[in-house]
Amino acid sequence: MENIEEIFNEILVYDVQEALKYSSDGFKKSGNPEYLIYTAHGYLVQGFYEDAIAAVDLAFELGCDYFEYGYNVKGEALLNLGLYVESRRCFERVTKEEPEQYLANTFLIELDIRESLYEDAINKCVDYMENFECDNKQLSDLKCIIGWTYLVNLNNPEIAKEAFIESIEANENCGRSYTGLGVYEANYKRFEEAIEYFNKAIEINEDDGENYFGIAICNKELNNFDVVEEYLVKANALELEDNRIIEEYAFELLRQERNKDAIEYFKEVLRENPNNIEIKNLILELEKIDEI
């Protein structure tokens, strides 16, 4: 008998539509509701969260007992819809049956962070490392989460730095920990050191836009303006909805005296944050100058 999960996930790596076709055809031919769980996963990957939830619910109604996979998919879909209470219930359902289930535990940590329960998030990371066997990647990822929580949310950069270093010691390919160290160094105005960390992170994962943004900011502070726009463009291409990048790019265009282009990007910033009086006034001033 074929391993449905294994085949589905192998296809999913290369082609979401083919993976969905495999699960859909499998359900039509066999009536096996397990296929619906994987259909739900395919919907989740594409961002069709309501469809993912409906597919999981139907699978359970038809007798599928693959609760771990199903509730993890449903929980993630609910999380992406901002339904945190319902999402938490799904992941807690998984951990009640399998306390060591790593994915569900990491999503519960993510929920704590989103709901500003930062100490709870850190405690969950520590408890998991103390109570369950972790491979090096899991250990590194949990240390990385602790680092970012201390750095961004709890304003304790020194403990954050320690966590990032421990994360890298466990797994030298944890790009996000190098990014964290880059932010740490940049906050202390050690821009050359920060750039080194951001570049190391890019070597590991070239698709994390925060590293290009960090390099752009550091070069701006070092007055290396020749490369600032290049790195902001790269950052924006990867993080299209990050308003920090758009605003910084607008100011770079303004520095280059490309006022018309700058105005358009400032307006984009304003669409995301209409209460930004400073940007609103700046646009008005630039438009007046442009009329002269």
What annotation goes with each model-predicted range?
Residues 30-31, 64-65, 99, 133, ...:
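Short coil turns that delineate tetratricopeptide repeat
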Residues 25-26, 58-60, 93-94, 127-132, ...:
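Canonical positions in the second alpha-helix
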Residues 8, 41, 76, 110, ...:
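Residue-level recognition of tetratricopeptide repeat
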Residues 38, 72-73, 107, 142-145, ...:
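Canonical tetratricopeptide repeat
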Residues 12, 45, 80, 114-115, ...:
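Register position in tetratricopeptide repeats
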Residues 33-34, 67-69, 102-103, 136-140, ...:
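Helix-start (N-cap) detector for alpha-helical repeat units in TPR-like alpha-solenoids
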